Structures are given as structure tokens and as C-alpha cells.
């Protein structure tokens, strides 16, 4: 029954996040178990979105006093303007306000000019304050005006030059993505007695403006939103009923005991050992939960899915207010309907 297919696919029960040396910037994110092939599918999709589609902030242009173009040099500054521009690309910024905004650097030598010398304003934070921009000799001074903006992905310098750009404004390639590195690995894993599932391990490094865990969450949300247009049907009804005359808010079949089903001895014993008494108990279990049951394998799972399908039911269903307080009395009352 294809309309129930997605509910029957195995899904990870939880996301494991292992922080790196700097938890705000580096972490390993693990999801398991996944259906075979889903590790590669999800890993590749998440990696591409992480690197290309998350919003961040970057310096988009600079104006330096007494400098007309990027091939100039500044008296008393060891780096030429080209090197200064390259160093400005490496400044990591967190921006919680709409851009563009103007910041500045004013420094006198001798000394090192770092990202920490950039003037901050409300809603803008410099994340790597120790990042070196240039070195000043004795008696040298420098003043720069920076334009910062928000965006996503990579934007070339020529796109950052406004039409009314003043003389001396130098546009800069903007790397907006807060995610610096992403790699993933897919390895086999087991769930219960089944060995052919995928384990997805992602290693994510950010600039500190976003934690790796949050970055993965936002990437997943983007994918979810983009895929929603392809879903052209309504969700099937749950096992809960709302317009009934017998006063029962769920399918009476849920009151049937699982030992009355025509199951193999092995499957029946597994359900009994897991304290699954009624069909209502059974259908709320997911495939992943069932496969964790000792001695319960794929053969038993397929058997149960087939039996439930014949009753118009499936694993992973939602039943409100289950179990009812008077479940034994209700089971006797409706046993003639089984």
C-alpha cells in the first residue's frame, strides 16, 4: 500500500552530536539507522545545502584613505592593498540586523591591525578578533571604511560594486556561508537483527556564528521546505476516530489481542516478551522500535506488516489517549466485532 510507504521506512531514532575541540565551531553529527542508500542521499543533499544556502555575513567592500585602487600600497603598511583585501575576506562576522552596514578601522603604528580593531555596532559581532589584517610600521596610520552585508553562498567582487560607487571603493569577493567545511561518511550499521542499514556521519565546521548542530538543522529545514511542493496528497487518517456512535474514539480492532493474530511462534513470543498485548500497542511501534526487540528480525517484521495491512493498519500509527483506562472491559464489549 504505497500511501503508507514513508511511514514504514526505518528512520533514525535520535541525532547524536559529538562536540569537537571548539564545540561552537566543530562537531560530528551522526544519524542512524537509515534505509540502505539513504545515507548517501541525505549526506550529499545536506552537504550541498550547508555550503551553499545558509545565510551569513561578510565584508563586501572597503575604502582606504589615500588609496584609489587595489593595486596601490599604503605608506608605512607592510602589506599592499591586494593582501589587505585578501585578509579582509577572512574576517568572520555574525550579523543579526538587515544590511548593508558601515564599519571602520582606525589604527596607528607600530603594531598589528586585527579584526578586533573593527568598530562594532548593534547586531554585528566580529567572531575571529585575532585574525590579522595588516602590520603598521612606526609612525604609520591607517583608516578604512568597510561595508558588511548578509547573503548566502559566494558572490564575486564585481557583483558587490554599486552603480554609484565612489572613487576608491574596492569591492571584495563575499563568502557568506557560515559553514567552512563539511564532510560525510556512510558506513553499515545494524538495527536489531538486521545488518544492512546506513549510518551517516557528518563532520561540520562553522565560523562560530552558527553551531554545527544548528547549521544541520537549518539545512534540513531548507530541504524540507523545497520538497514540500512535490507532496500532492493529504496525510492518511490516524487510527483515531472522531465521528462515531459507539462512543469509541478509535478503531475497535485495536482492542484485539495480538495472540489472536495468526502469527508464527517466534513472532508471537517476541511480542509477548516486549509486553505488546493489544493491536493498539503494536501499531504505535515503529519499525526501528520493533527491530530492537530481542530475537526479532526482518522476517518477523514483514509478517506483522502483512497481517496489519490486511486489517487496514500499519506500524507507526498515532492513537490518541491510548491505552484507555478500562481497556479490558472495552475488549470484552467489542470482541464480537473482531
Swiss-Prot record:
The keyword Transcription is annotated on this UniProt entry: yes
Keywords, in A-Z order: DNA-directed RNA polymerase, Nucleotidyltransferase, Transcription, Transferase
Residue ranges of the region described as Alpha N-terminal domain (alpha-NTD): 1-234
Gene Ontology CC entries for this record: cytoplasm; DNA-directed RNA polymerase complex
Catalysed reaction equations from the record: RNA(n) + a ribonucleoside 5'-triphosphate = RNA(n+1) + diphosphate
Coiled-coil stretches: none
One Gene Ontology molecular-function label: protein dimerization activity
GO biological process: DNA-templated transcription
Annotated region described as Alpha C-terminal domain (alpha-CTD), given as residue ranges: 250-338
EC number: 2.7.7.6
CDD domains xref list: RNAP_alpha_NTD (cd06928)
Keyword check for Transmembrane: no
Domains (record comment): The N-terminal domain is essential for RNAP assembly and basal transcription, whereas the C-terminal domain is involved in interaction with transcriptional regulators and with upstream promoter elements.
NCBIfam families cross-referenced by the UniProt entry: PRK05182.1-2, PRK05182.2-5, rpoA
Entry's family note: Belongs to the RNA polymerase alpha chain family.
Function: DNA-dependent RNA polymerase catalyzes the transcription of DNA into RNA using the four ribonucleoside triphosphates as substrates.
Subunit structure comment from the entry: Homodimer. The RNAP catalytic core consists of 2 alpha, 1 beta, 1 beta' and 1 omega subunit. When a sigma factor is associated with the core the holoenzyme is formed, which can initiate transcription.
Protein name in UniProt: DNA-directed RNA polymerase subunit alpha
UniProt source species: Cereibacter sphaeroides (strain ATCC 17025 / ATH 2.4.3) (Rhodobacter sphaeroides)
